[in-house]
Amino acid sequence: MRYWRIKAWKNNPFDAQREVLQELVTSAQYTEIGRKYKFSNLFNVRDFKAAVPVHEYEDIKPYIERIMKGEQDILWNTPIYWFAKSSGTTSDKSKFIPISNESLEDCHYKASKDVLTMYYQYKPDSELLTGKGLVIGGSHSINPVNNEAHYGDLSAVLFQNSPFWAHWLRTPELSIALMDEWESKIEKIAEATIKEDVTSVSGVPTWTLVLFKRILEITGKKNISEVWPTLELYLHGGVSFTPYREQFQKLIGKDINYLEMYNASEGFFAAQEQPGDDGLLLFTDHGIFYEFMPVSEYGKNDPQTIGLQEVEMGKNYAPVISTNGGLWRYLLRDTILSAAVTSTICCWAGSLAGPDALANALLMQARANCQRVGELLRESFESHSEALNVYKWTWW
């Protein structure tokens, strides 16, 4: 049943997006921001865009600070007790992104379940759930904001709120997963997991490689498949996997599946539908309404955006999102999306505020005829590949 629901929004992304926006606006119409922008009078996308300006973090920071002090019904209609602490690449100041119960259940967790469902559709004989998933999470433990609210990095918030049964399928234990000091953390993870039946690993490639090498040092094994013979899947994101793939294949010692995901504090946006796909499938029914702002519009007083159905191949965009966590027309300025050929979009982590952002965007546009982003990286960005975060997204 779950896969049929996935097919429904995958095959009808525009309808899914219209329904998401309607649900968001209806839910928040009696909040402070809903009353300010008269959400109850907004009946279509055009009205919504005309009424609500594009926001950046500094624009909504006063609202978030009030929520962190205990006020509610400000940005979203249900209580906000969790905040994901993140640092954007354009600022050394931390951001605190509100995490509602809806954004946990209907975005982050729902998307994770959909990734698992799509993988089982691809590999029906998978034994993924017969063992444990090794999760190399973030490094910020849960911290109190007040008597009711807490903050931590996204992985800490997700770990803390996950259902009890999820802990049975995950390793290492929470106290190790959320350690702050990475050298000690890697050592503890290695010691705790070498005797586990690990069937999947998820984490950023850099720290995963460090962990793999340490495990081989401890065990004296030739490769990771000798330590975890049932390992079949690696889930990754955060940076381009291209420069790391060969190292992973060598260290693991056998063929496994690789899945790329794109999630952040603001939401779970996309993932490969199955290993080997050229693009990431945009999640259009997960509490996020997407708009796309041409790079040339950045910095204007009234920047123009377009909808999903208006995205043009070969052009560059920055995503503007409205979410069930209370973000309204929020600009993800740390990420630039670039439309490519054959209904895919590649996304690389640049900075709209950076001095070379427009030049880089134009260069990416000039290379848009390349069919694979991996080829583009190898040919044009080989010396900088680790600094880029490149994705291709499939719309339909």
Predicted regions and their residues:
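Short small-residue beta-strand/loop micro-motif enriched in glycine and branched aliphatics
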Residues: 92-97, 355-358
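Active-site diphosphate/adenylate-binding microenvironment
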Residues: 15-83, 95-99, 106, 114-125, ...
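Active-site-proximal glycine-rich helix-loop-beta segment
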Residues: 90-93, 334
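Active-site glycine/GP-rich loop and adjacent strand/helix microenvironment
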Residues: 1-40, 47-52, 63-70, 158-396
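Short secondary-structure capping/junction motifs at helix and strand boundaries
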Residues: 94-97, 117-132, 199, 256-259
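Conserved helicase ATPase motor motifs in RecA-like P-loop NTPase domains
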Residues: 83-90
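Conserved AMP-binding loop of ANL adenylate-forming enzymes
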Residues: 117-164
